[in-house]
Amino acid sequence: MAKYTVAVAGATGYAGGEALRILAAHPDFDITCVAGHSSVGESMAKHMPHIPQLANLVVEDTAPEVLNGHDVIILALPHGASGKLASQLDPNAVVVDLGADHRLEEQAAWDEFYGGDFYEHWTYGMPELITGKAADGSYTRQRAALPGTKRIAGPGCNVTATTLALQPGIAEGLVESQDIVADLVVGYSGAGKNLKRTNLLAAEALQSALPYSVGGKHRHIPEILQNFAHAAGKSAAEASEFTLGFTPILAPMSRGILATVSARMTDKAKTLSDEEIRAVWSKAYEGQDFMVLLPEGTLPATGNIIGSNAAHLQVVTDRKAGRIYAFAAIDNLNRGTAGQAVQSLNIALGLPEDAGLTKIGVAP
């Protein structure tokens, strides 16, 4: 069988570069086009020396006529750019947007947090997302929507960690929808590759941690609430039933997200033992190969998931505070962005879901 040809726009950025790294080793894809903006005409040997297979490729302009003609098109572009370009792309190609333009279902949420043109919602690329329950009580998941789709919206990295941490408790009614709190320690690659005082100057970043987009302003908040609503078996229009205090904190590491998500226990949760609550998380992720519920007493650490598409998870209870604490550690560029996108792409094309991916991290 011939390999699928792939074009990647935004190829010299962090997200695009991680997509290239994964796809270059994938048995079913052939990277035949890399596109950019300020780097047009430059060799990939300059920008991605860690991917020698791409050394002979030259960055082309990010234009429909360049991207069309490929089986798969990956868009790793700033929000607003993908939406404008997408309508000009081949409807028969599978297009994956790693940006925000096609994630949100409700225009009101987009207008509040992003502004500008609102674009059509695409098939959401988080296979493990719980979307409700079937008649037999088993979970329905977003995975079922992916086979055959031609348009995939890649989730946000902070969204991924927060959702995977808490969704079992939401789906089983163990946590209250109000007063959910998420504190995330985030690696600097999550802030993008543009040179900023707080993100790429070593003298500003080393030995320092910095909160950002605080006070309910972070653009990932509406997407998280949308996912919480779906996990509860509700529509995106009902996401306002949930409230979230969300604080991301940049930490001096290149990759990784450690999410600590807490919520008030419901009366149902208070009747359960700690072992029974843990069993809910175990059941929710049974058969989900990239989801790793760590042994009791072992907490997730970002150092264990670097380079992998896995999420390391844990759940504990604080009976005195009346709260459940759920933890998730992911690689923001892999599981949080490109790895999850390739996983969804595999499903869309009928390939093995884990093709080209690993849940083995690099440690130390």
From Swiss-Prot:
Gene3D superfamilies: Dihydrodipicolinate Reductase, domain 2 (3.30.360.10), NAD(P)-binding Rossmann-like Domain (3.40.50.720). Its main location: cytoplasm. The active site is at 157. The keyword Hydrolase does not apply. The keyword Chaperone does not apply. PROSITE patterns: ARGC (PS01224). One of its GO terms (cellular component) is cytoplasm. It is an enzyme of class 1 (oxidoreductase). It comes from the Bacteria. It is found in: Cytoplasm. One of its GO terms (molecular function) is NAD binding. Catalyzes the NADPH-dependent reduction of N-acetyl-5-glutamyl phosphate to yield N-acetyl-L-glutamate 5-semialdehyde. This is N-acetyl-gamma-glutamyl-phosphate reductase. It comes from Bifidobacterium longum (strain NCC 2705).
